[in-house]
Amino acid sequence: MKVLVIGGTGWVGHNIVLELAKRGHDPEIFTRRSEGHYHSAVACFPHITGNKLDEEKLTGIVIKGQYDAIIDSVPHPEPIRILSRLKDHYGRYLHCGSTGVYTPLQSRPADEKHPFATRV
């Protein structure tokens, strides 16, 4: 399975990339920086550098990639709106950044009473 991992050089994302590869899938990494926190652990996988909030860039990547799945490990709701318009160009979408339901944060740290982000 060809999988785009958004935030694939961060803590959650790089573990997803490694597990996908271990299970025989073909992960590609979409990241803001070429040298992320855990970049060396996933340096052997294809990388695309860019910001997932850049609608034109994200759209181009998704249309060109024709991914079986997109796994998003970065907590921000805007790409969900972008990707929902592109749903014919990929198989499944999984958002797995738990703080994303609370963005933008009104206070730090956020607790269980913090309001949720706008639903899409």
Q: What is the predicted role of each segment?
A:
Residues 2, 26-28, 91-92:
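Residues at the starts of beta-strands that form the adenosine-phosphate
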Residues 30-38, 51-52:
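N-terminal Rossmann-fold cofactor-binding loop
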Residues 68-72, 94:
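N-terminal Rossmann-like NAD(P) cofactor-binding module of classical short-chain dehydrogenase/reductase
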Residues 82-120:
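Conserved Rossmann-fold NAD(P)-dependent oxidoreductase catalytic core, especially the SDR/UDP-sugar
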Residues 49-68, 78:
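Conserved Rossmann-fold cofactor-binding substructure of NAD(P)-dependent oxidoreductases
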Residues 35-44, 86:
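Short loop/helix-cap segments at secondary-structure boundaries that form the rim of catalytic
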